[in-house]
Amino acid sequence: RIALYKKETGPVVEYYRNKPGFIEVKAEGGEPKEIAKKIINKLKGKTLSEFKQYLNEGVYDPGIFKAFFLAGGPGSGKTFVTQSAFAGTGLKVVNSDRALVSGLKKANLSIKMPDEEEYFRNIIRQRAKQTTGSMFDKYVEGRLGLVIDSTARDLSSIQDQVNLLKSLGYDCHMIFVNTNLEVALQRNKNRPRQVPEYIVKKNHSEVQQNIGAFQRIFSPGKMLIIDNNRSEQELVTQTLKTAARFINSRLRTKPENGIALSWIKKELELKRR
C-alpha cells in the first residue's frame, strides 16, 4: 500500500503506518502520484535482499514499542517540551487538549474557558476524550511509539495505561516537568488558553502529590524530572538538551521485551509471504 497526501493524513494512513508493505508519501514540492512512481521504480531496481531490508525498516523504527508519559500541571511548560524535544522522532502524540481546543474553535467557543460556556465546553471535552481514545487504540494496534501528554493528576489512569502498554511489550518512560506554584500561575496568565486560577492550584497540588507514586511505577532510569522554574532562555537551552538526551538514548535501544520481539517476528513472517 502506498499512501499519497499533501498536507494531513487521515485515519487510514494512521492505521497502516509502520505496517508491513506500507509506503507513506508526503508530497512536498511535487505531486504525490509522481513521487510514488519514482519510489516504485527505485524499488524495482533493487535486489530481493535490498527490497526486504527496505520493508523491514518500518518494523525496526526507533519509536516502535516506546511510550513516553509527559506529566506536569498547567503552566509547567510540558507542551513546549513535547513540541521541541520530541520533534522529528516520529512518535505519535496522544493529547486530549489538542482535540478540545480544535473543538472549541469549531464551535466558536473561547479557549480561555469562561464559566458561562462550561455546559457546552464539557460536551466538547467528552468528544475530545473519545477522539483521543480512538487515536490511542489505533496507534497501539500498530505498536507505534507514543507521547502521552497529560497533567497526570489521575494516578490510577496512568497506572492502567502503563499496565496495558507493558502487557503489549512496550517500554514505558516518564518526563515530569516540574515548576513551583508561583511560576505556574504566572505562565498560565501569559498563555493563550488560560485555565482558571483555582484549577491551576488544584492541579498543581495533585500532580506534586503523585511524584513519589510515579517513581514507583516507572523503574529507575525510566523517569526524568525536569526543573522548569527558570527563564524561557534556559528552557530553550539546558532544559530541552536534558530532555532530548533522555529521549534519544531510549529511542536508540531496540526492543528487548519478549512480547515485543514475538510481535516483530510475526510481522516479519507476514512480510515474507
Q: Where are the model-predicted features located?
A:
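Conserved substrate/cofactor phosphate-moiety recognition/catalytic segment
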Residues: T82-L144, S156
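The conserved Walker
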Residues: G73-P74
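Conserved phosphate-donor/acceptor-positioning beta-strand/loop module used by diverse small-molecule
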Residues: K166-R187
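Conserved lysine of the Walker
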Residues: K78
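NTP-dependent small-molecule kinase module
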Residues: A3-F51, G58, F214-R273
